[in-house]
Design a protein with these regions (language model features):
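Conserved beta-strand in the GNAT
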Residues: 56, 62-70, 77-82
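A general lysine-centric signal
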Residues: 146-147
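Conserved GNAT acetyl-CoA-binding A-motif
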Residues: 97, 104-117
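Conserved acetyl-CoA-binding loop-helix of GNAT-fold acetyltransferases
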Residues: 83, 89-102
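Active-site rim helix/loop that mediates acceptor-substrate recognition in acyltransferases
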Residues: 24-60
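Conserved N-terminal entry element of GNAT/NAT acetyltransferase domains
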Residues: 1-17, 150
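Conserved active-site alpha-helix within GNAT-family acetyltransferase domains
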Residues: 118-140
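A conserved beta-turn-beta hairpin within the catalytic core of GNAT-like acetyltransferases
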Residues: 71-81, 88, 138-141
Length: 150
């Protein structure tokens, strides 16, 4: 299934190049950029578990970002959301979230949740997400959610 918004598409990795880009963006942006070298494991079994949907944000032949959408009943969990560094601060994070929400809606999801980096909380708030609990605002990875319209 392919979801499009403007010139961007959300697609499941298919080729070796797709998977390489998917894992490379996650490793560099979510781990190494935060000083965690040698920690990322591209072969985690949950990556391809039932209900888990790795996705790439692409525009033409450019790999822009990644997210894994885990669907469990009427809730989807956005995991490891990242925009590659050259494409940051261009509105693509908002595009990625909007496409992930369209994906979730197509899978009968009514609520999207994500554990986000503390410095990303203001961005998620601007995108309509709410903190699960007020005490979560000070957590290392606050839990946030958004109710989707039917």
């Amino acid at each position: 299934m392919r979801f499009e918004l403007g010139r961007c598409s959300l697609v499941e990795p298919q080729s070796d190049a797709d998977w390489s880009a998917y894992h490379d963006i996650r490793r560099r942006i979510l781990f190494e950029r935060r000083g965690e070298y040698g920690v990322y494991d591209a072969n985690r079994p949950d990556e391809r578990a039932p209900g888990h949907h790795p996705q790439l944000l692409v525009r033409a032949s450019d790999y822009l970002g990644v997210v894994r959408i885990d669907v469990a009943g009427t809730t989807a969990y956005l995991r490891r959301v990242a925009i590659d560094e050259p494409y940051q601060r261009q509105g693509l994070g908002r595009t990625l979230l909007a496409l992930a929400e369209l994906f979730a809606h197509a899978h009968s999801v009514t609520r999207v949740e994500s554990s986000v980096a503390r410095d990303a909380v203001p961005f998620y708030l601007k995108c309509g997400y709410k903190l699960v609990g007020v005490e979560d605002a000070d957590a290392l990875h606050p839990q946030m959610y958004k109710e989707l319209r039917p």
